[in-house]
Amino acid sequence: MYALYFILVVVLCCIMMSTTVAHKMKEHIPFFEDMCKGIKAGDTCEKLVGYSAVYRVCFGMACFFFIFCLLTLKINNSKSCRAHIHNGFWFFKLLLLGAMCSGAFFIPDQDTFLNAWRYVGAVGGFLFIGIQLLLLVEFAHKWNKNWTAGTASNKLWYASLALVTLIMYSIATGGLVLMAVFYTQKDGCMENKILLGVNGGLCVLISLVAISPCVQNRQPHSGLLQSGVISCYVTYLTFSALSSKPAEVVLDEHGKNVTICVPDFGQDLYRDENLVTILGTSLLIGCILYSCLTSTTRSSSDALQGRYAAPELEIARCCFCFSPGGEDTEEQQQGKEGPRVIYDEKKGTVYIYSYFHFVFFLASLYVMMTVTNWFNYESANIESFFSGSWSIFWVKMASCWICVLLYLCTLVAPLCCPTREFSV
């Protein structure tokens, strides 16, 4: 239900940022101007659209999740009174969310509020990105560690490691080559060439560091699989950043405007702007929601706190993200004759409630900054969101470099602090 609330508010924010929807409402809703004046939203409801309206709505949603984050601190049993607040009262929660989003429009001194809230949103958005990058690095280490544990009993795991590593590096190399072909030209596109060279060099660097003797002595499980996963993600972020970069327009020898440094076939993808907007917005919502849900599991919160399973307890399996099938619990055994019921929260919560709400709190800020085009908020609208902007470009490039830095830290930290115990 929390995910449904989140989706409803995100869709509302996208509608508020759509100039097309605003014009359609003005054309087709009778007495539109009278209604806008009646609710004191301006002559054409300008207070209910644009980046300032999105800031207010996301402020209400962020406060909603932050309050529940505080209310659910230190809950270890799903039968406690405060746990019922988290797991029930859905109708009243919906009313509370609506009241908080609406109440944000009545905050006095709106200019000061919007300026201050913008910086809070930027910090929260970057924290949300940081959590995703940390979990990606942890995922790469966990994958290699789990499959390496299987080599002790079955040598076929070596072949699996080699095959997946080869696939990862093939994808990363192929992606960089294709971007060099389609996003650069013989004359010009120097920025794209530099960025591709830098990011390609970073992929080579992390690969060499991962297999260097000094790192191997401290971390025997370090290998090319982790660096291959990170290299693939760096390649993806590089492609995403170049795709988000504003098009460069120059004059050709005939005095006509020509767009350079983008694929020729990319021009046709933006002809139907409504289709691009709908598909792009749906993909954006889906990715953010997936990031929220995968970031709020018990294993992810344990990983962020540095708690991992002991190496001797690792059981190699293809689907290593899921717990291995063990013996039936008492409840499962009793239910074999009838429906199988698993009481997954009988002895404790399967995820940390407060951490769950905190991630959604950060996601609210990330949505606010993303939908309003980060620092180009004044000219932002959802129709031009996918045509590219410098703010989104540099956010993605910064995410790419931070991801590499985080991975390098996991490799180098044991060398810099030999007396400390590092477990990945």
UniProtKB/Swiss-Prot annotation:
Key word Lipid biosynthesis present: yes
GO biological process, one term: antiviral innate immune response
Example of a GO MF term: phospholipid scramblase activity
Reaction(s) catalysed (UniProt annotation): a 1,2-diacyl-sn-glycero-3-phospho-L-serine(in) = a 1,2-diacyl-sn-glycero-3-phospho-L-serine(out); a 1,2-diacyl-sn-glycero-3-phosphocholine(in) = a 1,2-diacyl-sn-glycero-3-phosphocholine(out); a 1,2-diacyl-sn-glycero-3-phosphoethanolamine(in) = a 1,2-diacyl-sn-glycero-3-phosphoethanolamine(out)
Listed GO CC annotations: plasma membrane
TM helices/strands, residue ranges: 7-23, 53-73, 88-108, 120-140, 162-182, 194-214, 222-242, 275-295, 349-369, 392-412
Cytoplasmic side: 24-52, 109-119, 183-193, 243-274, 370-391
Keywords: Antiviral defense, Cell membrane, Glycoprotein, Immunity, Innate immunity, Lipid biosynthesis, Lipid metabolism, Membrane, Phospholipid biosynthesis, Phospholipid metabolism, Transmembrane, Transmembrane helix
InterPro entries the record matches: TDE1/TMS (IPR005016)
Glycosylated residues, chain numbering: N76, N146
Residue ranges that the UniProt entry lists as topological domain Extracellular: 1-6, 74-87, 141-161, 215-221, 296-348, 413-424
Subcellular location: Cell membrane
Family, as annotated: Belongs to the TDE1 family.
Function: Restriction factor required to restrict infectivity of gammaretroviruses: acts by inhibiting an early step of viral infection. Impairs the penetration of the viral particle into the cytoplasm. Non-ATP-dependent, non-specific lipid transporter for phosphatidylserine, phosphatidylcholine, and phosphatidylethanolamine. Functions as a scramblase that flips lipids in both directions across the membrane. Phospholipid scrambling results in gammaretroviral surface exposure of phosphatidylserine and loss of membrane asymmetry, which leads to loss of infectivity.
Descriptive protein name: Serine incorporator 5
Organism placement in taxonomy: Eukaryota, Metazoa, Chordata, Craniata, Vertebrata
